Amino acid sequence: MGWKTVMKQQKLIEKMTIEEKAAILSGKTVWQTREIDRLSIPSIFLSDGPHGIRKQAGAGDHLGLNASLNATCFPTAATIANSWNQDLGEEIGQALGEEAVSMDVNILLGPGLNIKRSPLCGRNFEYFSEDPYLSGKMAASYIRGIQSKGVYACPKHLAVNSQELRRMAMDAVVDERTLREIYLTGFEIAVKEGHAKAIMSSYNQINGIYANEDKHLLTDILRKEWGFDGIVVTDWGGSNDHVKGVAAGSNLEMPSCGYDSAREVIAAVRNGKLKEADLDERVGELVDAVMELTSGKKLSDKNFDRNAHHQLARKAAAESMVLLKNEKQILPLDTKKSIAIIGDFAFSPRYQGAGSSMVNPTKVEDMSSILQQYDLNILGMTRGYQRNGDVDENDRKFALNLSMNADIVIFCFGLDEISESEGLDRTHMRIPQNQIDLLQDISKVNENIIGILSAGSAIEMPWHTCCKAILHGYLNGQAGASATLDILTGKVNPSGRLAETYPISYEQTPAFRYYPSNEKTSEYRESVYVGYRYYDTSKVRVQYPFGFGLSYTEFTYSDLIIEEDGIKVSVTNTGDRDGAEVVQMYVGLPNAIVFRPEKELKGFAKVYLKAGESRQLRIPFDDKTFRYWNIKTGQWEIETGTYQIMVGASVADIRLTGMTERTGNSKGYPYNPAKMPYYYTGIVQKISDEEFRELLGHDIPNGRWSGNLEINDAICQMYYAKSRLARLIYRCLTKMKKKSEAQGKPDLNILFIYNMPFRGIAKMTGGAVSMEMVYGIVDAVNGHFMLGVKKIIGGYFRNRRNNKKYEKLLKGAGGKCR
């Protein structure tokens, strides 16, 4: 098998008919694979669950329109990344694995580790960081925990999936170096260190090739370079050409699309477009996984320890919150002072994002219900503002009066549900204005405001001067309220550090002019300068830098020792409280020949120290510490030079610096600095076509739509349709989308359809619609109504006949593939 060992189930594969082989590579239902009864190959169950299991009790659907079983809602990945604690990630992973086992889930679809290219990505709350090294390390910890319970983790979405707009119909135009260093490194760590047994391919194209059909990605890189020995699963409805996917290295098309894809696979084998050896290899990899996941498995324990998992969620939330500001040490709270609590989020917490990751929690805390458990002098509490933007003048006046009479105001605010969701990117970085208006009015009557933020991604903070303290809870799960009060009262010393940069304004961000995309392409002109790599290199002042976070104590650094294989550094807690520090190691190469960021995170350690305690830490170098991807030679290389090793409390707070000499192995440098001046300065907001073309090494693809709509164009592009009916459908969809936005809650079904390509109609309807029928729909949309209707009607009856015929072939094999 080339880079692989012989399949464990080789004899079983040899007994399968070609119809069974083709059928098993597509799902049976929305969440299950097909079983083959005559060969005792069982079905397995896949479920969403990056921060909690979302297994539906009734008929399954991709977006959770039907209720799911109760599960622990842990803080989202964006929150846990702020803990910088791999042990915590593994502990959460173990709990997720336990709950998956209790619900008979075999593969858990998570964690998500796409890079936060822009703060506007609607799904950033599901992703760890703007930094690939931190993302990969945290993902690997989750994966180890999940898989320790006999469940496969399925990190997603491979790769370059950094936007929701037209995500199923978008082509990411990115150079190979940026692809490798920024967008693949996290997955590489997840595979090599987490030993992930499944990977989900992304919806989008990468340089003109769908991720699920990209042999360079799925075979050359994933399997051969990284040693991946698991299965590749499509995102739901993310299969474009199933035959090409199988040839490239994809094992499982989800969800069920009937037998349409299976027929395509058989035809491709018979006409020579697909090698039967490739088909056998994909089937072998999948059957190996199925048998490993089900062999010797006992009946699951349906009763996981709900209370223990709730307490873990509380611990995780407390360790992941970031104290951004604490003037005059207003925190921890003085229990003698009177406190007013204002804000809708204190009554109805926003603890998770919207979309396929939405969990039905075992219980949810809110601040208003648990205050009696804490020794606080609460003067009163009220909402003060409406979540949907409406104004209740009486409640507003009451909030101001309450604030005027209190010693301290705790103001709970943040992004509402419509601001962050799968299927919908943000259009700005601002918190709803009605919340800020109230905050500013309160600041005029009380200067002692403690802001409690809830948001899954970076926001603009022009109002930060209104607050004496700011505690950012992100989306902190079902136990977030008690975790917040634990920090406010000093029961827990905050130790979260930002896993992403907070710019002053969206216009500062590196991809500001390129995000989200043209009509067909998204151009990654900023190259490797993502997040702090851009701000730090181009000297852009930010609100809060990557890695930043305050504590109730102080830490000093000393005695940096640089060795051949790592560093040693001493850290001392010089305050009067026990606490934890996140020690961050950055590496840079001054006067580099190859352009690169000024510094990059290459190691970190979280250390817990008692008051007055000192400890020496060791942070090792690894194979990623000094490397860069040489596009000229097509390999990882090290540039010869004197590297700067910087150790600090954030990317902007470097405490100790040293140097180390490294002899490189470069076999020719890839760039001409004269042709790429802005890449060498890091000022990448206005990259010209000429410079981007030089970076890519080829012409820039045309990103504009032209001509008739095709099966891979998004349904939201029907504003170009020649059919009046199609344009009417587009207007209706747009109206329904805007209505849900105005109500403050995203309609996930509408959002999914809106951004779905026409081919998705066949991929998401369980076999009721064939690709032939989709071509008829597209003909009708393009103005050929009668031709389209003829194809739709004829295709419908042919699809029914062919499905029945396929079922008979499977039964004729002596059993059933269901």
Residue positions per predicted region:
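Long, low-hydrophobicity ectodomains and other hydrophilic envelope-associated domains
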Residues: E694-R818
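Glycoside hydrolase catalytic-domain context in secreted enzymes
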Residues: M1-K624, T642-V647, V651, M756, ...
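Terminal connector regions
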Residues: D623-P670
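Charged, amphipathic alpha-helical linkers/stalks
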Residues: V651-A652, G658-I729
